[in-house]
A protein has these predicted regions:
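Extracellular/periplasmic, surface-exposed regions of secreted and cell-surface proteins
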Residues: 1-188
Length: 188
């Protein structure tokens, strides 16, 4: 694959990162083999912009950052999915090979793609000893690669294909506190 990234930072106040990845896979048919997935991430440290927030006299509210990101992630098919299941047949006296026609792959199988985004805030209190991180996220996965049972009249029993979408979202909250913090030891 090929990966590229561009980063920008303005005096530690704002940051932006844009990435792109182009992958080729041998586990999908040639026309669906290449796929691209990008991402963008950014953040703004508001505490650097608000007068008095980083003042050493104001240690009860010491840091505030807003952040967000969006990304796509690709996933290809498992290895050997398109081989027709030839294998050794050990019960024949001289060995041999067998063909197992009970498994099929949809020939229009495409990569599974997930798209996600997240927004969050990072707040620190009491000279950074108490930290609160709150984020909301959403993930949508399309073209899931699954193996399903099909009617025997199709000529096989199982087929792998792109089937369905899944969406999930939620809130993540993290609260951390430094109980003891000195030059020799930190207990969080």
């Amino acid at each position: 694959g090929v990966f590229g990234e561009v980063r920008a930072d303005y005096k530690g106040l704002a940051s932006l990162s844009v990435t792109g990845r182009w992958d080729w896979t041998s586990t999908l048919l040639y026309e669906y083999s290449p796929y691209f997935y990008p991402s963008i991430t950014g953040g703004v440290t508001l505490s650097e912009l608000i007068p008095g927030m980083t003042d050493t006299k104001n240690d009860w509210f010491s840091y505030l950052k807003l952040r967000g990101n969006w990304a796509m992630v690709g996933k290809d098919a498992p290895a050997y999915l398109f081989d027709r299941r030839f294998g050794q047949y050990p019960t024949l006296p001289d060995g041999g090979y067998s063909y197992n026609p009970s498994f099929s792959t949809g020939f229009n199988l495409r990569p599974e793609m997930s798209s996600s985004w997240e927004v969050g805030v990072d707040v620190r209190f009491f000279a950074g000893r108490t930290r609160l991180d709150v984020a909301y996220y959403s993930i949508q996965t399309n073209n899931q690669i699954v193996t399903v049972r099909v009617p025997v009249t199709a000529g096989y029993v199982l087929q792998t294909r792109n089937e369905g979408s899944v969406k999930n979202h939620g809130v993540e909250i993290s609260l951390e506190q430094d109980i003891i913090k000195n030059s020799d030891w930190t207990w969080t």
